[in-house]
Amino acid sequence: MSEDVKVQVHTLGEIIVKLEMPKTFIDEINNVFDEKEITTVDWSTQLAGKIKKEKLVNHLLDDNIKGTFQMCFKEYLKRSGLSLIQTHQPVLDNAWINDMFAGEYNPAHFHSSKNSFVGLSSVLFLKTPDTYGEEIINPRTPSNGHLEFIGGQQHSLAISQLRLSPKVGDFFIFPYTLVHTVYPFSGTDQVRRTLSYNCDIVPKVMVKPKENK
């Protein structure tokens, strides 16, 4: 391409923001969950996953942890360039931890909230197994244990799917309505642990002072 030609690329559709969270933050969440899991509520009936251990953890997260998540959701709004950042604010909803083992999986689904039609969901990787097992076929394009986002555009000039094998500390934020799935894995008894946090995006005039922290 000639240096005289200026190129810009514009994309439409959903925005996914990835952050890399520090090990101290990951360790803090893992430690409090391991110590106090007995106090958590089974959340599996509220979720799409075919996963035995899915626990609501709102009460395990202290104000510092919640504040960090709040800042991450604000960063999403800032990075996305959406005009909503001027008129709306993120308000934390429910958080839960999935301990996923071999043979379990999460069917394609999206998130919602009883409080808002507009919102962000997320997934933070807390633990990953050393292996996801042998691929049945085509090992050069692995799927075992992978997280996949599925966009709304399916034509040949669009990127319609994004399949990822994240590492511990990776934190993905995306709209409630973005369809996503997690493939099963095998060959290990180690856990694949993630935390998901829903966050409503509501008009600033509706946010009470205590929710504005």
Locate predicted features.
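Generic detector of short, locally flexible boundary/turn motifs and exposed helical patches
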Residues: 58-62, 83-91, 136-140, 158-165
